[in-house]
């Protein structure tokens, strides 16, 4: 019996200063690719503690995430000055990812109060093929797309 090789994941961004940068990623998670992209755009550029607070507020449905790209037929909300929503499932996964990022920073010896999120993206993962049974013995495809989320933070100041 041969040994099975585990997949090797790479990051889509290059690190300018590896000594002051930390990375964390989630691979093949079952969340919406569209809402993952919107949440990643919302936390990019924030300090780590502010990003965690934003995600906690989204989970508690106190603050909304503005929808910038996937906004057709979405209701307008005064809080976001346009379409927005509460992507709770994505926020839960991303909050765990930010806690992992913070632990990586502490292990590396970085000051977590000075961390800013410099890179947050969601990529499409593999597609799981599923089918809905229909009348007269037919079936319609209903595929599920998994998501890869990667986050990088750098120490500023």
Segment roles from a protein language model:
Residues 66-71, 129-132, 143:
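Generic, ordered loop/turn and secondary-structure boundary motif
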Residues 37, 115, 145-147:
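Residues at beta-strand starts and edge strands
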Residues 14, 120, 154-156:
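Generic beta-structure capping elements
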């Amino acid at each position: 019996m041969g040994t099975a090789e585990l997949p090797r994941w790479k990051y889509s961004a290059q690190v300018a200063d590896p000594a002051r940068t930390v990375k964390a990623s989630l691979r093949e998670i079952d969340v919406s690719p569209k809402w993952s992209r919107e949440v990643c755009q919302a936390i990019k550029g924030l300090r780590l503690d502010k990003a965690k607070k934003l995600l906690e507020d989204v989970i508690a449905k106190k603050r909304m995430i503005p929808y910038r790209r996937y906004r057709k037929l979405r209701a307008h909300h005064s809080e976001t000055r346009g379409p927005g929503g509460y992507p709770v499932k994505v926020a839960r996964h991303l909050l765990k990812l930010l806690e992992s990022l913070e632990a990586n920073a502490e292990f590396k010896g970085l000051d977590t109060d000075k961390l800013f999120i410099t890179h947050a993206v969601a990529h499409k993962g593999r597609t799981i093929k599923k089918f809905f049974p229909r009348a007269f013995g037919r079936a319609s495809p209903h595929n599920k797309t998994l998501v890869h989320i990667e986050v990088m933070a750098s120490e500023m100041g």
